Amino acid sequence: MSATTPSSHLIFLGTYTKKGSRGIYAVRLDAASGALSAPTLVAETPDPAWLTLSPDKKFLYALHPSPSQAIGYSVTVTPERTSLTPLAIPASAHVPTAPAPAAQPPSHLAVDATGRTLLAANYRDGFVAAIPLGPDGTLSPPTLTWHSGQGTDPQRQASPHPHSVTVSPDNRFVIVCDLGLDRIFSYALTSPNPGAGGLHSPAATLTPGLTPSVATAPGSGPRHFKFSADGRHAYANTEMGGTIEAFTYHAATGALTPLQSISSLPADFTALKSGAEIRIHPNGRFLYTSNRNHDSLAVFALATGTGLLTSVEIVSCGGKTPRNFALSPDGSWLVCAHQDSPDLTVFRVDASTGRLTPTEHRAPVSMCVCVLFYD
């Protein structure tokens, strides 16, 4: 390895703590071989099912079943150890108007580029929270943006279900996929300047964009969202539709124009569709998504000029219910987590074709549902 290439990548793992897992784990991926170290518990906390880092990587935030919506940790990484130290959650950080029960956790988190706002999509209660962050990483009272309405499926879409929050590359907009409404919302993000002499800035504000939302197919359920490497296009996977929706992204207004819809499943698949995660390769040329009920990973070639997708392959994920996966920063490896089988699987990634080759490397983690590369 060169002096600038790490010999291993640190990964944080989020879990559901129902079948033996106890919280957030850390594991290392050998950059040359793809081998995984034994996972170690770094934070004992209930159901940290989504994790995100501050831009400077000093703080990690996890979903938390409390009125604060999330819990923060200071991150310490040395050659000898990796540790997470929980930050205090003051009572003032609690959601002021959350409906009972007031401890419903969100489904997804993101930190804006300034590191001063934590955004949370609350699937169960139907709102998006903008939570101010102090220089010490601690949370303050949020502002809430509520969604209203319903979709076409009376069981799954009787009310709004914001499923993810994604900050635009220029930090001017927040994109929210609402599974319950079959809509993807675009909000202008106003991040206030740090308060003079105060610990926390005022809360950021979310204002509907000039084109406030774009519809997906009825009953499709948009879930997660990613921007292309050049920021000209964007992609959402649909949980209930089993598709990838491609858009032209208009950076000046935050608007999305539908471009393409392509299935992530084989043509002969007739069981319940359940799309999970979506990622774009660091080189910008390939898109990956996971299909839970099919236990597969789908690979697409991404035309950087037009933004259009072409199917490359669909491969077994090597486990059951691939709720989450992530690519290493150098794009050489893909690590897949499984909600219903107790292990991680590792794939070698061909950077020229996007294709995945399974390896023998695994690591035991029960109900792992989030993979977050630290470096």
Question: What residue ranges belong to the model's regions?
Answer:
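Residue-level detector of Asp-centered blade-edge/turn motifs that repeat once per structural unit
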Residues: 5-7, 55-57, 113-114, 169-170, ...
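Short loop/turn segments immediately following the C-termini of beta-strands
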Residues: 16-18, 65, 123, 133, ...
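Short loop/turn segments immediately following beta-strands, especially the blade-tip
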Residues: 28-34, 74-82, 131-139, 188-195, ...
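Blade-loop segments of beta-propeller domains
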Residues: 38-111, 115
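Asp-box/WD-like beta-propeller blade repeats and closely related beta-sheet repeat scaffolds
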Residues: 82-164
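Surface-exposed loop and turn segments in beta-propeller and other repeat-based domains
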Residues: 89-100, 143-157, 211-214, 259-270, ...
